[in-house]
Every structure is written in structure tokens, then in C-alpha cells.
Amino acid sequence: MSAIKVIGAGLAGAEAAWQIARQGIEVELYEMRPVQMTPAHHTGHFAELVCSNSLKGAGLDNAAGLLKEEMRRLDSLLMRVADQYAVPAGGALAVDREQFSQEITKLLQEHPLIQVHREEVKSLPQAGIAVIATGPLTAEGLAREIQKMTGEDALAFYDAAAPIVTLESINLEKAFWASRYDKGDPDYLNCPMTEEEYKRFYHELLKAETAEVKGFEKGKVFEGCMPVEVMAARGEQTLTFGPLKPVGLIDARTGQRSYAVVQLRKENRAGTLFNLVGFQTHLKWGEQQRVFRLIPGLENAEFVRFGVMHRNTFLNAPKVLKADYSLQKTPQLFFAGQITGVEGYVESTASGLVAGLNAVRRLKNLPTLIFPQETALGALARHLEGSPSVDFQPMSINYGLLPPLEVRIKAKKEKNAKISARALAKLEEFKAAEGLD
């Protein structure tokens, strides 16, 4: 049988390549890094995590946790490696990003059915089956080709990555260990603020200079990765109801709740690096150091990486994609990852998993898989196909995408757990019916 091309070896492309190869089909995997880098990536490794190192909630009362469990049950490579290189993060799944991407790169490069090409692809394949997983930073030449193929203008907004600081530079006499509502282990470092400290920080944040933006469309910002300075501009209390909310965080040393709290999450397994949760930013690097050192406990913080901003380009999925992730008018071409309009690491990986499975089905002239709407995988794909196309915006997985339960349950945690149980039961039924191992 012919090989399937996978263009892009980010989260979605890496997962798609794995799913294709595990079914005995050869893969031609193309990745332009490190020959041609993007504004946001730092390495040539596959599945590099460029924003946070968190893969969101781990529990089955969390939609992202459900999606991850569904992927595990379909032998997701990225979930397997994420579990292998997990770092403590309370109720979330976070990974050592370097070990994570290095292991995925190694496994794919050494796979006997995967041929890796380190080169930029500038045109869409004219024959055969292909998965396009070029991500939010799709190279300009290929982006133009996609526009010609789909007839749709690409949309753009800002994504932002948070700064990382060293543990040894954090003042542990001011910061304290805790997880919100004592959920899970106390894996977060928390920097408490008084009202006076918060207001000083807030006003300096508003005055701080942002870096020059080149080649981006201004003004379109996805809520889930909004720069902290953009959020602050919405009002003085916005941050205290967002990433700096103090609820559920009590400093055991004082027994008091602070006016605001900045949380820091482990960036690596060794626990030597921490990222500032919710502090994606486009401030100039000098300004980041000046303003973020106003946070109690970070007065002498050593920044090993400053926050950066980068472009995100995505399709108007309802107009051009099917729920199997293929193009409506060119069904031999599949798309996966953030370019489809899913948002988030886990969601991108999930789309790659489904696109990879379906690329093989198309090659074998079998009906493609449309996962049940009761599953997170199915709900996400059906959202892309069935949303209104006017002002379509990226979406993360959430329980609102899944059908409600037949019996109303008021307790949110219990309700979500039952939705997850239903989803996993439906997935097992679907796997049995479709012969998925």
C-alpha cells in the first residue's frame, strides 16, 4: 500500500504518524524544524510544548481528563509518553517538556515504518492520502496553498507563553506550597499579595511596554491563552477573578486568605523550574523582569525564559472540514491540530489521533470513523463540523460540547463524572463495533 504523508510533527502530526504506523502503513513524516524555525519553537524536537507544560486536568470530572482517558484507550503515543514523564501538578497532568518531546522524537525516528524528512513543505500533496498538521505557525507558502484549496481566508489571533523562573531564586519565606482547595498534593508555589501589593503590581503592569508585533493580525485573542496584560486592561479586579484568584488557597503559616495569589507550577520533573500560571505575555523582556519581580517572593527571580507571543492560523472548520477531519471537497486530505480550530495541547493531539486513524481508513477504502457524540473525541470533531461558520473561533474541550444527561444532577462534580462514565462506555461500544484495538 502507498505511504501516507504527514506534514508537521507537532503534537497532532506526531500522534497521527504513530496511529498510521501502528496499523502497518508506511508514513512519510515531514518537519521543517530545525532547518526552518518558527517564532515560538526553540528546538527541532517533535511535539514540542511551546506554551505551558500542563496537559490540563487529570480527573474524570474534568473534560480534558476525559479526553485524555479516551486517547489512552486508543493507544495514544503522546498520552503514554506524557504519563511516563509526568511532573507533580496537583489535579492536573503536567510533563517535563524536554524529556517528553525528546522521547516522542526518538520513538518516531526509530520506527521502521516512519521515514522522517527534515524539510519545509511548500505545496499540498497532489496525489495520495495526507494529513496536514502544520499548526498555528504554518509557513507562509503552504498557508497560501491551503487558502487556495479551501477558498477561505486564514484567521489569526495571538497565542502567548508564560515566563519560567528557577526555584532557587524564589523567596520561600514569602511563597507557600498548596493546591487550590487542597485538591491533590500541594504541588504549586503560591505568592500571596496584599491589596496594596496587588494594586502596585496591577498599575505597573498596565504601564509596561509591549514588544513590537510583526506579521500578526491585532485584536483577536483566544480567551484560554490571553496575555496577562490584555486581561488586566479589562479592569482592576479581572485578574483577581482569573489567574490571581485567591479562593481555595490558604497560607498555613497565617491561616488567612490573601487579596490575590500568583501560582507557580513545576516546569520539569526535577522541580527546579517553575512557570507563572496564567502569565502568558507579550511584554518586552526587560519589562517582564521589572514588573513580575514586584510579585512577593519573586523579587530576585531568575528568568530562564521570558514570555513570548506567536501567531495562530486556523481554518473556518464548519465550512471546509468534515467530522472525520477531512476536507469536504478534497477528502484525501485530512487536517489535524490547531489549524483545524481545536485549541489546546490535548485537543490538538486528539485531532491527530482521529485524523491518523481515518487516513488509514481512507487508504483502505473503508468508511471513516465518526466517534459518538457522547464521547469527548466525537463532541470535539462534531463541534468543528457543526458550529456556525460566522465568526468561528477555536474551542477547547468542555462538557458543554457533550449531550446533557437524561437525568438532571445539580452537583457539578457528580454530573461531570457521570458524563465521563457514559462517554467511556460509549467509546468501548464503538471500539468493539469498529474493531479498534
Swiss-Prot record:
Any one Pfam family match given in the protein's UniProt record, by short name: GIDA
S-S bonds: none
GO molecular function (one): tRNA (uracil(54)-C5)-methyltransferase activity, 5,10-methylenetetrahydrofolate-dependent
Catalytically driven reaction(s): uridine(54) in tRNA + (6R)-5,10-methylene-5,6,7,8-tetrahydrofolate + NADH + H(+) = 5-methyluridine(54) in tRNA + (6S)-5,6,7,8-tetrahydrofolate + NAD(+); uridine(54) in tRNA + (6R)-5,10-methylene-5,6,7,8-tetrahydrofolate + NADPH + H(+) = 5-methyluridine(54) in tRNA + (6S)-5,6,7,8-tetrahydrofolate + NADP(+)
GO cellular component: cytosol
InterPro entries: FAD/NAD-bd_sf, MnmG-rel, MnmG_N, TrmFO
Keywords for the protein's UniProt record, in alphabetical order: Cytoplasm, FAD, Flavoprotein, Methyltransferase, NAD, NADP, Transferase, tRNA processing
Enzyme Commission no: 2.1.1.74
Main location (coarse class): cytoplasm
Subcellular location: Cytoplasm
The protein's enzyme class: transferase
Cofactor(s) this protein cannot do without: FAD
Residues where FAD binds: G8, A9, G10, L11, A12, G13
Domain of life according to the entry: Bacteria
Biological process, per Gene Ontology: tRNA methylation; tRNA wobble uridine modification
Free-text function comment from the UniProt entry: Catalyzes the folate-dependent formation of 5-methyl-uridine at position 54 (M-5-U54) in all tRNAs.
NCBIfam families: gid_trmFO, PRK05335.1
Record-stated family: Belongs to the MnmG family. TrmFO subfamily.
The protein's name: Methylenetetrahydrofolate--tRNA-(uracil-5-)-methyltransferase TrmFO
Gene: trmFO
